[in-house]
Regions:
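A two-mode feature
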Residues: 14-17, 21, 30-338
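Active-site-surrounding "flap" and adjacent substrate/cofactor-binding loops of secreted or lumenal enzymes
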Residues: 1-4
Length: 338
């Protein structure tokens, strides 16, 4: 698409409509905004309640996490995100040598949180988590066994795999004939590893005991998904085929679709015909990704299900207060210097 450009793509727009309808193509648009992805990686490294005991369970394992990520967003700038990304992507065997860098990053975030976070409870949760990390930097989840596995295009490929699984479930397809990806030497192996991992998870879920599946199906983070999606049913179980040499027509069509849709979303110049095509594709596409807008959308979806404060009965209020105070006592007993 980039080689053809607007001038040579515009004349084939009618053919693209015809081909799309005739072949009944399913189009998915999945994206990652890199600054937001770096922010989410920082959140995962610091606020994992399974590693950082100062983080309340609900602040990590429920959609309440989206409030924390949004608050964390107000504390970072481009330089801090670069530092955080470097610490998240360093190989894990080297992370011990970066402990001072982790402490410096968290100390800067703590200083900003003390003055920028207006909500008292949010400020308390964030500063407690940062204080724990400053005291125990190597207990956090910085570093990775393989930087390629958390590269944006490999993570985004997981959205693609879930999209393929969704189509298979909807159309009742038992096995895809072929899954072809474009040639990306350093990432194709990681893409196949991601596919194999998700397929293996699906197989494991299928063999799990009913009570184990029940825990997963009732998890707060899974409320918006149906049972088949949660259990990863339909995940591609054939090895990826990497396009070799001249890209096949399917890869070329995907490239054209993505090029046009990217330019529509980024408000870049297009002919009226191509712009109409892009809008038409996006309206019918499966659409998901990692960006601040999508994170806020997920929070708002959850918030709509919550009762208003005045609708909570006295037992619910007492339980909420007790949960908060019990956690405060546990944090105070940690002696993390707050």
């Amino acid at each position: 698409a980039n080689d053809l450009g607007v001038a040579k793509l515009t004349p084939i727009v009618p053919d693209l409509y015809t081909l799309h309808r005739k072949m009944q193509f399913e189009f998915g648009y999945y994206f990652i905004e890199k600054p937001t992805f770096a922010l989410v990686m920082l959140f995962e490294a610091v606020f994992d309640a399974g590693l950082n005991s100062a983080v309340p369970w609900v602040s990590y394992w429920t959609p309440m996490r989206f409030l924390l990520i949004n608050a964390l967003h107000s504390l970072v700038d481009h330089r801090l995100l670069q530092q955080a990304w470097a610490l998240c992507t360093v190989r894990r065997q080297s992370i011990a040598r970066r402990a001072d860098d982790i402490v410096a990053l968290l100390t800067t975030l703590d200083a900003r949180a003390s003055s920028r976070i207006q909500d008292a409870r949010m400020r308390e949760i964030i500063r407690d988590a940062l204080a724990y990390g400053i005291k125990k930097p190597l207990e956090l989840d910085f570093g990775t066994p393989d930087p390629n596995l958390i590269a944006p295009n490999v993570v985004c490929f997981q959205f693609v795999l879930h999209g393929i699984a969704s189509v298979r479930r909807r159309k009742g397809r038992k096995r895809p004939a072929k899954v072809t990806v474009d040639q990306q030497g350093q990432y194709n192996g990681s893409q196949e590893e991601a596919r194999w991992t998700l397929s293996s998870i699906a197989e494991g879920f299928g063999q799990a005991r009913t009570e184990d599946r029940g825990f997963l199906l009732n998890h707060p983070m899974m409320r918006h998904l149906d049972e088949q999606a949660i259990l990863h049913q339909g995940m591609p179980n054939v090895e990826l085929s990497v396009a070799d040499g001249h890209p096949p027509i399917g890869i070329q069509l995907v490239d054209v679709y993505l090029w046009v849709c990217n330019r529509v979303r980024n408000r870049q110049p297009l002919s009226p015909e191509l712009r109409d095509l892009g809008v038409w594709l996006l309206k019918q596409a499966s659409f998901d990704g990692i960006g601040m807008d999508t994170l806020r959308m997920r929070w708002e979806q959850f918030e709509r299900e919550l009762p208003a404060i005045h609708e909570m009965d006295s037992d619910q209020v007492r339980f909420a207060v007790k949960t908060r105070e019990d956690h405060r006592e546990r944090v105070q007993a940690m002696n993390i210097g707050r």
